[in-house]
Amino acid sequence: MSEGRVRASWGALFFVWSLLAVFRAPTYHLWLFALVATEWGHWLAAPALLTFAPGWRRTRGGSAGAVLGLAAAVLFLSPVARAAREFGLAWSGPAPLVLPRLWLGAHVPAVREESLVYARACGDELRLQLYRPMVAAGRLPVVLVVHGGSWQSGSRLEMPELSRELAGLGYAVASIDYGLAPRNVFPGPVDDLRDAAAFLRARAGDLSLDMGRVVLLGRSAGGQIVLAAAAASDPIPGVRGVVDFYGPNDMRLAWTIPGSPWILDSRRLLSQYIGGAPAEYPERYDEASALLRAGPKFPPTLMIHGGRDELVWPVHELRLSARLAALGVPHEYLELPWATHGCDYAFNGPCGQITTFEVERFLGRVLGGAPPFAATYPDRSV
């Protein structure tokens, strides 16, 4: 293959990939490439520009490759540009988005980490990963983290960076495993979350935990679980706030208007998680839907969603935000226009930085040690 064709092919490859930084992915596997394009695109811009290596003007193929590479670099950098326009861009923190951190990363403090068995489900041990600061003065407020995975997969060990970051700030973070569908159907995972909280409450003395100051944090399926737990008629004691990363909160809506099966077979997943269709288990669908169950005593809530999420529609958070506003419940809805599902997987990417900043501020407000709930920068309180 000639040099011109190599340049043209290289530029075309990166240009097609970069389109996923601005357009929705049509399939599940392309969503994975979209996640990389939107949250690691600033890393991909440089190899895209290799088409401008000396000699690019010698052939038509080289010139075409250079143009495509330049266009790809611009699109790969667009998520950072959009994030900076929305949240500002700083050279050092604390700030929502710090430019050097995109490439250099952030210092994550050393913390104490241990694995504890808190219960058994379906004959299996259920463990939690407990993160605590190396040195603690007094009892620590607790963040209970519930992983995603369509209720059928995932692990407490996923995405540990935020847990370590929060532990370094003086929180105890317990990331839990829970029984997975289809063996463990709703409300099984919510009951597992309760068991984890009860276990920590029983061990609060020797683990130096303040179980009167608890925040529930869930991602995707875990977001649904923590919202359902908070909306239950018998909520977990001591919960002062909920953080929901891109979780569904209206299971009837998720069934009635499913997403593209090329992306996610949501009806199959719901049927395996709830135990069947809404016509078979109407009460379970209602109990699993925080939108339908939330009342005036629902805890303060931070909802985070990517504006172009292909797996869980942002309308879930918009409707819950309106519901909480009608109930007078303090809440905040943070929508990231460029971001897709799982955007915080890149801890140092634009989504990871901004959401970490917002989560830390939210925890300070609801657990103490920070200004009242009203947001200060930018104002997203509803």
Range-by-range predicted roles:
Residues 201-216:
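Gly/Ser-rich "nucleophile elbow"/oxyanion-hole loop immediately N-terminal to the catalytic nucleophile
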Residues 3-5, 11, 18, 24-27, ...:
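C-terminal catalytic histidine-bearing segment of alpha/beta-hydrolase fold enzymes
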Residues 138-149:
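Short beta-strand element of the alpha/beta-hydrolase
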Residues 185-205, 355:
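Alpha/beta-hydrolase active-site loop
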Residues 297, 303-305, 309:
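Short beta-strand/loop motif that positions the catalytic acidic residue
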Residues 21-46, 89-138:
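N-terminal cap/lid segment of alpha/beta-hydrolase-fold proteins
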